[in-house]
Design a protein with these regions (language model features):
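Short, intrinsically disordered, charge-balanced linker/junction segments flanking boundaries
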Residues: 1, 76-79, 370-376
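Beta-strand->loop->alpha-helix junctions that form or flank phosphate-binding loops
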Residues: 3-6, 41-48, 90-93, 186-221, ...
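Phosphate-binding loop of NTP-binding sites
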Residues: 10-13, 21-190, 259, 266, ...
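A short acidic, helix-capping loop that chelates divalent metal ions and anchors anionic groups
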Residues: 98-99, 141-146, 337-338, 362-369
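Short internal beta-strands
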Residues: 166-172, 328-331, 352-363
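Acidic-glycine-rich active-site phosphate/pyrophosphate-binding loop
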Residues: 212, 218-241
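Nucleotide phosphate-binding/pyrophosphate-handling subdomain across enzymes
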Residues: 235-355
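C-terminal helical cap/extension that packs against the catalytic core
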Residues: 346-376
Length: 376
């Protein structure tokens, strides 16, 4: 039963109440559950229990979690066979699937694989012990929780150490390279780095294996993004493999996201060619370069990008997809703390657009009075 509104009566007679970090202690349902002596469990604890019953793949990182986990779920849903078919997934947004079908962000499948976003914002991903951990990047974020960049990256080092089979990391992020070099030798030895850079450019990989991404085009004006994965021998077979991939979602960042999803699918046991073919029909995650429509030659794109790096990647993708068009942005900052921490970086990222309108800040869990130096 779905109840609308937060009311104490909603938890009457319940044995267990599950909450997320977005729910405050003074929430009427949490207060009522405490008073009734009901068991109160954080969402991450439930997700950790579900992972223990499946072959779990987590996707963590400041950017790209939803798209990467959506791509992997899409691959498994459309190309999974046997135990890889009908996966479970817990994703922070709906998926624009094959033939325009919209899949909910959560599904309890009968297969033995679970794909889940691993939220680092509050440190709760420390509870997870997946088979495979994907780390898209570890650029500083959520400093309201971690305090320093070093603390933030240390959390990713810890998370990588919990993966029992493999770690898959993007090597185009300097934060990830710092995390990689801080890994225990055993963990680094089962780590796969995917990157648009070659080994000489990346430097010390601490014993990790490199899968290189080679972009095939300067623009995605045709509506497609083409790239090739160079997979070394010994990773998914004795021979070196060159896998051509075509995406319908633009942007080099999406080539990176798709690379992680394809590698994860291959490590789970899917043929890598089958995985790369399946990702071609992926149309996007909700509010990730989602084209809402075109009126009078004006195309409206909706995107949840709320960190400077995400905004820069979004605008680069827009330039690749629409190289002859003017790019006009309406941007609503998310969180007073993030706006304060990254004000200069936001300005630099938004400068990639031709015109920018900045609206009021969306506070989410924060209160403006706690940030008197930030204009709402």
């Amino acid at each position: 039963t779905v109840e609308f509104g937060q009311q104490a009566k909603n938890v009457e007679g319940k044995n267990t109440v599950v909450f997320s970090s977005a729910i405050k202690p003074d929430n009427p349902e949490i207060v009522a559950a405490h008073e009734a002596g009901e068991r109160i469990v954080h969402r991450s604890d439930i997700l950790a229990l579900l992972m223990n019953a499946k072959r779990a793949v987590t996707v963590a990182g400041a950017h790209g979690k939803t798209t990467t986990s959506s791509m992997l779920a899409h691959i498994l849903v459309n190309a999974g066979e046997g135990e890889l078919a009908d996966p479970s997934y817990a994703i922070g947004g709906s998926i624009q699937g094959k033939d325009g079908a919209i899949l909910d962000g959560g599904h309890a499948g009968k297969g033995n694989v679970l794909v889940a976003e691993a939220d680092e914002s509050d440190g709760s991903f420390a509870k997870y012990h997946p088979q495979i951990a994907i780390i898209t990047n570890s650029e500083a974020d959520h400093l309201d929780h971690y305090g320093t960049q070093d603390n933030y990256r240390a959390a990713f080092v810890d998370h990588a150490g919990h993966a029992t089979k493999a770690v898959i990391m993007c090597g185009d992020d300097e934060g990830n390279l710092a995390v990689l070099r801080a890994l225990d030798a055993t963990v680094a030895g089962r780590t796969i780095v995917y990157s648009t850079r070659n080994a000489a450019e990346l430097g010390d990989l601490n014993g990790a294996t490199l899968v290189r991404i080679e972009s095939e085009s300067e623009t995605a004006e045709s509506g497609a993004e083409h790239f090739t994965l160079h997979i070394p021998g010994g990773l998914i077979g004795e021979e070196e493999r060159r896998i051509a991939v075509t995406l319908t979602v633009p942007g080099i960042h999406n080539a990176r996201n798709a690379s992680a999803a394809i590698i994860a699918a291959a490590l789970l046991g899917m043929d890598v060619e089958r995985a790369s073919a399946a990702v071609t029909s992926f149309l996007g995650a909700a509010r990730r370069f989602q084209v809402r429509g075109t009126v009078s030659q004006v195309t409206v794109v909706d995107d949840y990008a709320h960190h400077p790096t995400e905004i820069a990647a979004l605008l680069d993708a827009a330039r690749r997809r629409y190289p002859q068009s003017k790019i006009r942005v309406i941007f609503q900052p998310h969180l007073f703390s993030r706006t304060r921490f990254f004000s200069s970086e936001f300005a630099q990222a938004l400068a990639k657009a031709d015109d920018v309108i900045v609206t009021g800040i969306f506070p989410a869990r924060e209160k403006q009075e706690d940030f008197p130096d930030v204009t709402p």
